[in-house]
């Protein structure tokens, strides 16, 4: 059956706080990234993704501090993205305890960054994040949080990123993000089938069946979700049990 499929909660961090409606009832502090990371670790998450959505560069050291703290207490792989512009940024995040670094806008502005970072640290720790929107018969890559069109075809871009050394693709449907209507399965499948590296499906999860669909119909290797876990509607463990009942191999 191949490798177990992964469930990855995603935490958006700004100014040292997790945002996007984290409402864990029993948390003393609903915005504390370390406490939330520990909670997901306890629930059996396979990995965690932290996206630093802080616009200003003066807060960069804050995310490094958070990653150091989380890495000291949580022993599942951590992917960190947001504001990675040069190889030095990759180095600092890996040194702080990140296992993988996600590159998004900078990969488009400077594709060589992906090649340089993969060359220095290995493809296994370089993730390229692609935000895509439906455009005609295909999908177009957007940057700056889905606000800026690039004119790039998402499938071709994913193939190019793989060829430059990306070890994983984090694929978000901007059409579905936040809708809770499920992944864009056609997009997920098209990219998953076009590349050999793992694809993480993101954007649109509203229930546990959506996670199953992402793997079975979308051919994704991993599924990422935020609000369904943050709001406490489902635990990661419930999600894994549901996927397992539907014939998907997961790490229980």
UniProtKB/Swiss-Prot annotation:
Query: Predominant location of this chain?
Result: cytoplasm
Task: Indicate where this protein resides in the cell.
Answer: Cytoplasm
Report the Pfam families cross-referenced here: His_biosynth
Keywords per UniProt: Amino-acid biosynthesis, Cytoplasm, Histidine biosynthesis, Lyase
Name any Gene Ontology BP term. L-histidine biosynthetic process
* Domain of life from the UniProt record: Bacteria
Which GO molecular function terms does the record list? imidazoleglycerol-phosphate synthase activity; lyase activity
**Active-site residue list:** 12, 131
E.C. number: 4.3.2.10
Its biological purpose is as follows: IGPS catalyzes the conversion of PRFAR and glutamine to IGP, AICAR and glutamate. The HisF subunit catalyzes the cyclization activity that produces IGP and AICAR from PRFAR using the ammonia provided by the HisH subunit.
Complex formation: Heterodimer of HisH and HisF.
Q: Identify the PANTHER family for this entry.
A: IMIDAZOLE GLYCEROL PHOSPHATE SYNTHASE HISHF, IMIDAZOLE GLYCEROL PHOSPHATE SYNTHASE SUBUNIT HISF/H IGP SYNTHASE SUBUNIT HISF/H
Kindly provide the name given to this protein in its UniProt entry: Imidazole glycerol phosphate synthase subunit HisF
- Organism, by scientific name, is Nitrosospira multiformis (strain ATCC 25196 / NCIMB 11849 / C 71)
- The encoding gene: hisF
């Amino acid at each position: 059956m191949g490798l177990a499929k992964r469930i990855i909660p995603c935490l958006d961090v700004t100014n040292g706080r997790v945002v996007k409606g984290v409402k864990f009832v029993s948390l003393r502090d609903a915005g504390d990234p370390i406490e939330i990371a520990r909670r997901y670790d306890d629930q059996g998450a396979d990995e965690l993704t932290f996206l630093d959505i802080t616009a200003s560069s003066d807060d960069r050291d804050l995310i490094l501090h958070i990653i150091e703290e989380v890495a000291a207490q949580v022993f599942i792989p951590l992917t960190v993205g947001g504001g990675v512009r040069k190889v030095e940024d990759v180095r600092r995040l890996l040194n702080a305890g990140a296992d993988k670094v996600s590159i998004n806008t900078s990969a488009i502005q400077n594709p060589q960054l992906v090649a340089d970072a993969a060359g220095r640290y290995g493809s296994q720790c370089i993730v390229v994040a692609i935000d895509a929107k439906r455009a005609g018969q295909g999908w177009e890559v957007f940057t700056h949080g889905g606000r800026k069109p690039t004119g790039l075809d998402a499938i071709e871009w994913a193939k190019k990123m793989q060829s430059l050394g990306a070890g994983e693709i984090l694929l978000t449907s901007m059409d579905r993000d936040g809708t809770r209507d499920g992944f864009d399965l056609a997009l997920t499948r098209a990219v998953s089938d076009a590349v050999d590296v793992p694809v993480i499906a993101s954007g649109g999860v509203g229930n546990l069946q959506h996670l199953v669909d992402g793997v079975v119909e979308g051919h994704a290797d991993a599924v990422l979700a935020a609000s369904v876990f943050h709001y406490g509607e489902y635990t990661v463990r419930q999600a894994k049990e549901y996927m397992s009942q539907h014939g998907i191999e997961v790490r229980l």
